[in-house]
Swiss-Prot record:
It catalyses: N-terminal L-alanyl-L-prolyl-L-lysyl-[protein] + 3 S-adenosyl-L-methionine = N-terminal N,N,N-trimethyl-L-alanyl-L-prolyl-L-lysyl-[protein] + 3 S-adenosyl-L-homocysteine + 3 H(+); N-terminal L-seryl-L-prolyl-L-lysyl-[protein] + 3 S-adenosyl-L-methionine = N-terminal N,N,N-trimethyl-L-seryl-L-prolyl-L-lysyl-[protein] + 3 S-adenosyl-L-homocysteine + 3 H(+); N-terminal L-prolyl-L-prolyl-L-lysyl-[protein] + 2 S-adenosyl-L-methionine = N-terminal N,N-dimethyl-L-prolyl-L-prolyl-L-lysyl-[protein] + 2 S-adenosyl-L-homocysteine + 2 H(+). The gene is Ntmt1. The modification N-acetylmethionine is found at M1. Gene3D superfamilies: Vaccinia Virus protein VP39. It is found in: Nucleus. It comes from Mus musculus. This is N-terminal Xaa-Pro-Lys N-methyltransferase 1. Distributive alpha-N-methyltransferase that methylates the N-terminus of target proteins containing the N-terminal motif [Ala/Gly/Pro/Ser]-Pro-Lys when the initiator Met is cleaved. Specifically catalyzes mono-, di- or tri-methylation of the exposed alpha-amino group of the Ala, Gly or Ser residue in the [Ala/Gly/Ser]-Pro-Lys motif and mono- or di-methylation of Pro in the Pro-Pro-Lys motif. Some of the substrates may be primed by NTMT2-mediated monomethylation. Catalyzes the trimethylation of the N-terminal Gly in CENPA (after removal of Met-1).
Length: 223
């Protein structure tokens, strides 16, 4: 439980905001110095997502996606814009969203909205998105705020829409990272929060071919 490791919720959020403000707006910055894993990550994400875009009558649409904790748009550029007609981005750091406008290049014209907001305060427009992609950012929310955010995301889905969470998983329990002011939860804790939010787990997959020294990374498709 995050309540056991976070002493001051307000400080937990403000410290993270301050941390990201001093990170360079680059792919390497977004990935904490692990920019070289970006291709491995994106290729696996594409395969994971495409199974839902391909399936028969209940397949997920490709009109609109939301990139949560989008940063400069690493995922928007390489995963979402190639597959969706329009994309919205949300991130707490204004400088990252400003950089996205040049980083995304010509295709960035299809980014409809740049929302500058922490996810704990963000509400996706109801019934708007085929896919809501939430990667490497759930650790910046408390358990309660994460469950509430996922409930709002559920309302934000179009028919047959899905939510994808992709994130680090701890071996056991909840671990606080005091540097960037985030937590890493184990699989069971994350699954419990997903259930609390009233979502069903459609698929779960471990990311392969990552460096040994980093956390295990899992993807979850939810509805």
């Amino acid at each position: 439980m995050t309540s056991e490791v976070i002493e001051d919720e307000k400080q937990f959020y403000s410290k993270a905001k301050t941390y990201w403000k001093q990170i360079p707006p680059t792919v390497d910055g977004m990935l904490g110095g692990y920019g070289h894993i970006s291709n491995i990550d994106l290729n696996s994400s594409r395969k994971f997502l495409q199974r839902f875009l391909r399936e028969g009558p209940n397949k997920t649409g490709t009109s609109c996606a939301l990139d949560c904790g989008a940063g400069i748009g690493r995922i928007t550029k390489r995963l979402l814009l190639p597959l969706f007609r329009v994309v919205d981005m949300v991130d707490v750091t204004e400088d990252f969203l400003a950089k996205a406008k040049t980083y995304l290049g010509e295709e960035g014209k299809r980014v409809r909205n740049y929302f500058c907001c922490g996810l704990q305060d963000f509400s996706p427009e109801p019934g708007s998105y085929d896919v809501i992609w939430i990667q490497w950012v759930i650790g910046h929310l408390t358990d309660q705020h994460l469950a509430e955010f996922l409930r709002r995301c559920k309302r934000g889905l179009r028919p047959n829409g899905i939510i994808v969470i992709k994130d680090n998983m701890a071996q056991e329990g909840v671990i606080l990272d005091d540097v960037d002011s985030s937590v890493c939860r184990d699989l069971e804790v994350v699954r419990r929060i997903i259930r609390t939010a009233g979502l069903s787990l459609l698929a779960e997959e471990r990311q392969e071919n990552l460096p040994d020294e980093i956390y295990h990374v899992y993807s979850f498709a939810l509805r």
